[in-house]
């Protein structure tokens, strides 16, 4: 799968150095993998969840559930864009904002 950019992961690795290994591993695994559908990605990342308020957005738990990585995943074209890496508290706010906007 083509990882469009690793900027969000690199920035997060600097901001949360205690989780750098997990963030790098996430990026490498996505970039080296072929994931035909969400179930195949979930087989590798059991914590993967669909972000129900935005189409094609998925959430990875990283660092023992301390960080959330929100990514747009296009299975048909095998592309992944890491949108944001955030703490659990920031993710709760992100969810609340998008819940009020409705699904897009």
From Swiss-Prot:
<dbReference type="InterPro" id="IPR018669">
    <property type="entry name" value="Toxin_HigB"/>
</dbReference>
<keyword id="KW-1277">Toxin-antitoxin system</keyword>
<keyword id="KW-0694">RNA-binding</keyword>
<dbReference type="GO" id="GO:0006355">
    <property type="term" value="P:regulation of DNA-templated transcription"/>
</dbReference>
<dbReference type="Pfam" id="PF09907">
    <property type="entry name" value="HigB_toxin"/>
</dbReference>
<comment type="similarity">
    <text>Belongs to the HigB mRNA interferase family.</text>
</comment>
<dbReference type="GO" id="GO:0003723">
    <property type="term" value="F:RNA binding"/>
</dbReference>
<comment type="function">
    <text>Toxic component of a type II toxin-antitoxin (TA) system. A probable translation-dependent mRNA interferase. Overexpression causes cessation of cell growth and inhibits cell proliferation via inhibition of translation; this blockage is overcome by subsequent expression of antitoxin HigA. Overexpression causes cleavage of a number of mRNAs in a translation-dependent fashion, suggesting this is an mRNA interferase.</text>
</comment>
<dbReference type="GO" id="GO:0017148">
    <property type="term" value="P:negative regulation of translation"/>
</dbReference>
<comment type="subunit">
    <text>Probably forms a complex with the antitoxin HigA which inhibits the mRNA interferase activity.</text>
</comment>
<dbReference type="GO" id="GO:0043488">
    <property type="term" value="P:regulation of mRNA stability"/>
</dbReference>
<keyword id="KW-0255">Endonuclease</keyword>
<keyword id="KW-0540">Nuclease</keyword>
<keyword id="KW-0378">Hydrolase</keyword>
<dbReference type="GO" id="GO:0040008">
    <property type="term" value="P:regulation of growth"/>
</dbReference>
<dbReference type="GO" id="GO:0110001">
    <property type="term" value="C:toxin-antitoxin complex"/>
</dbReference>
<dbReference type="GO" id="GO:0004521">
    <property type="term" value="F:RNA endonuclease activity"/>
</dbReference>
<protein>
    <recommendedName>
        <fullName>mRNA interferase toxin HigB</fullName>
        <ecNumber>3.1.-.-</ecNumber>
    </recommendedName>
</protein>
<keyword id="KW-0346">Stress response</keyword>
